[in-house]
């Protein structure tokens, strides 16, 4: 009897680790680079804060690169598994003729997320206020400056003719340059724009996203190697993003702000709530991570308008919606 009990106990001890491994799958670490740290990308911080990535067996480590080019470089070098960047970066890489070009696997935002900041408050802002003025627009060829040029042109403002747009300052240095005295206006993302206004360093006078209309603005890229070797990780990542996109649709501004607050230690809860409210009202976030071809064509039109388009890559060559569609249950 004792011998039988000992054998059963030994078998139980052998099987116990297997049972535990089924209940707790091995966590995979994903290195993901982003352009900047902004509430504009709220769904991904919510996915982190609410444990959506963890529930998919993912440990997502985020590095802030300071611009789309740097984020894309990290992906191309293998330093990043995924990167969040402007889709124009992928267009440029394809037009360089790179065979192993990165692929867009999901879309996060659907319009420009920046705000026009002036040095003094404007009770009734008019785009004519920019006549003869200088605007810090960001890096030439980047989405922030291209949508800015698009909007300004629609309002009769042409760089070099009746205004000046500075296109030589890196994205992550724009706020510092403006604070240091350069330019009459600058475009900034949240929460920097609101924090700037609270500190009296500048004043929000216009919402670029409302003026520009819908356009794919920030997307998730994966390398072809990642797609080939670890498709399940991409799908798991996008499932978490989709859950966050759906969650923020019905969450209160306060709940959304609290969920992402750990990733914005320098911003107050009130500021985060105000920013969430602003981006929600402007319909900035995608409701699912699937990019639409019509939106992609609009993107190419914006790039072409800015004189930065040397070729029009086919939608199916740059975008792979397979993972996003599975994540969203389509």
Which functions belong to the PLM regions below?
Residues 228-309:
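Secondary-structure end/capping motifs
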Residues 98, 170-264:
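Pocket-lining segment of extracytoplasmic ligand-binding domains
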Residues 2-10:
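Sec-dependent signal peptide recognition
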């Amino acid at each position: 009897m004792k011998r039988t009990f000992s054998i059963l106990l030994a078998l139980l001890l052998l099987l116990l680790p297997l049972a535990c491994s089924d209940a707790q799958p091995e966590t995979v670490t994903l290195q993901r680079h982003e352009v900047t740290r902004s509430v504009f990308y709220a769904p991904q911080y919510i996915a982190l804060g609410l444990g959506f990535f963890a529930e998919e067996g993912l440990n997502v480590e985020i590095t802030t690169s300071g611009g789309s080019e740097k984020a894309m470089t990290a992906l191309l070098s293998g330093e990043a598994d995924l990167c969040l960047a402007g889709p124009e970066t992928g267009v440029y890489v394809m037009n360089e003729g790179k065979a192993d070009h990165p692929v867009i696997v999901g879309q996060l935002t659907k319009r420009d997320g920046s705000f026009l900041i002036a040095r003094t408050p404007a009770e009734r802002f008019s785009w004519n206020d920019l006549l003869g003025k200088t605007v810090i627009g960001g890096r030439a060829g980047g989405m922030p400056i291209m949508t800015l040029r698009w909007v300004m042109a629609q309002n009769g403002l042409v760089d070099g003719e009746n205004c000046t747009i500075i296109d030589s300052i890196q994205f992550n240095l724009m706020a510092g340059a403006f604070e240091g005295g350069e330019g009459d206006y600058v475009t900034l993302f949240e929460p920097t724009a609101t924090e700037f206004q609270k500190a009296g360093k500048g004043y929000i006078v216009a919402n670029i996203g409302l003026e520009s209309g819908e356009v794919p603005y920030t997307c998730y890229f994966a390398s072809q190697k990642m797609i080939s070797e670890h498709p399940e990780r991409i799908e798991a990542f996008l499932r978490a993003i989709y859950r966050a996109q759906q969650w923020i649709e019905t969450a209160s501004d306060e709940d959304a702000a609290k969920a992402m607050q750990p990733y914005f230690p320098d911003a107050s809860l009130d500021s985060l709530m105000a920013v969430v409210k602003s981006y929600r009202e402007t319909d900035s976030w995608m409701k699912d991570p699937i990019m639409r071809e019509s939106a992609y064509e609009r993107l190419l039109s914006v790039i072409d308008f800015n004189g930065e388009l040397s070729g029009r890559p086919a939608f199916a060559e740059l975008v792979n919606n397979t993972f996003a569609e599975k994540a969203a249950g389509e």
